[in-house]
Curated annotation (Swiss-Prot):
InterPro entries: DNA-dir_RNA_pol_omega (IPR003716), Pol_omega/Rpo6/RPB6 (IPR006110), RPB6/omega-like_sf (IPR036161). The RNAP catalytic core consists of 2 alpha, 1 beta, 1 beta' and 1 omega subunit. When a sigma factor is associated with the core the holoenzyme is formed, which can initiate transcription. Promotes RNA polymerase assembly. Latches the N- and C-terminal regions of the beta' subunit thereby facilitating its interaction with the beta and alpha subunits. The gene is rpoZ. Belongs to the RNA polymerase subunit omega family. One of its GO terms (cellular component) is DNA-directed RNA polymerase complex. This is DNA-directed RNA polymerase subunit omega.
């Protein structure tokens, strides 16, 4: 697992500031939707995968203008069933 460097990515974007914005936007998408990765994960974090995608040319500065899939609201999880050992506590009050 080779580490990615900023110099690898700067060939694809104009400056470091644009690189930060591009990588952070892509990393947020990858954190919520890991199946959309254009490179293999190799047990990396979303930020590393985003930088690898930029270095390999899969993600370009045009990505900043694209609308991305976001989940504005958290996933609703079902409430857990009441435990039997806690059901008798209401009777004691």
């Amino acid at each position: 697992m080779a580490r990615i460097t900023v110099e690898d990515c700067l060939d694809k974007v104009e400056n470091r500031f644009q690189l930060v914005l591009l990588a952070s936007k892509r990393a947020r998408v990858l954190a919520r939707h890991p199946e959309e990765a254009k490179v293999t994960w190799d047990n990396d974090k979303p930020t590393v995968v985003a930088l690898r995608e930029i270095a390999e040319g899969h993600i370009t500065p045009a990505y900043m203008k694209e609308k991305v899939k976001t989940d504005r609201y958290p996933i609703e999880r079902p409430m857990p069933a009441p435990r039997d050992d806690l059901a008798d506590l209401d009777d004691d009050i």
